[in-house]
Amino acid sequence: MTGRIHSIESFGTVDGPGVRLVVFLQGCPMRCLYCHNPDTWKINGGTEMSVDEILAQYEKNHVFYEKGGITVTGGDPLVQITFVTELFEAAKSRGIHTCLDTSGILFRPESPELVLQFDRLTAVTDLVLLDIKHIDPRAHIELTGQKLDFVLAFARYLDKRSVSVW
């Protein structure tokens, strides 16, 4: 399985606990006015990489990551949910802490098929950095071009699943 990777930061200290390998994925449905990664918006940008290639990057510096792990961010990593799930499943099989940095904008509680995908992903996610862009619904649309509803639905879903959230 491959994903579209914007970049990889080998010594991340602000994207979850400890020192982390931070993987920035391509693709984001939001158009945040203050976005510091607008070059991640398009899904076809970046470089194609496999799960094994990313884990090989982790292994190069694994001694630094022992109290940290892997964080996947973007863009919004949920654009590539199947890839992230496979990466996290492989990471968890190696005892690596997993962290997902997302707004949750792509969560759709009315879609049973999508909820099953989220169930599979959250089963191997240790921590979610939930990026709520604005709490006011109108301001959220102005800021991101997207409704707040799905973000809040994702927050409720994470709570029901007892997923740790920062």
Model-flagged regions — what are they?
Residues 1-20, 55-56, 61, 160-164:
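Auxiliary Fe-S-binding modules of radical SAM enzymes
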Residues 1-4, 28, 121:
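Extracytoplasmic/secreted proteins and extracellular or luminal domains
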Residues 7-49:
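Canonical Radical SAM [4Fe-4S] cluster-binding loop centered on the CxxxCxxC motif
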Residues 38-70:
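Conserved alpha-helical substructure of the radical SAM core
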Residues 59-69, 78-166:
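Conserved AdoMet/S-adenosylmethionine-binding subsite of the radical SAM
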Residues 74-75:
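Short acidic donor-binding/metal-coordinating loop in glycosyltransferase active sites
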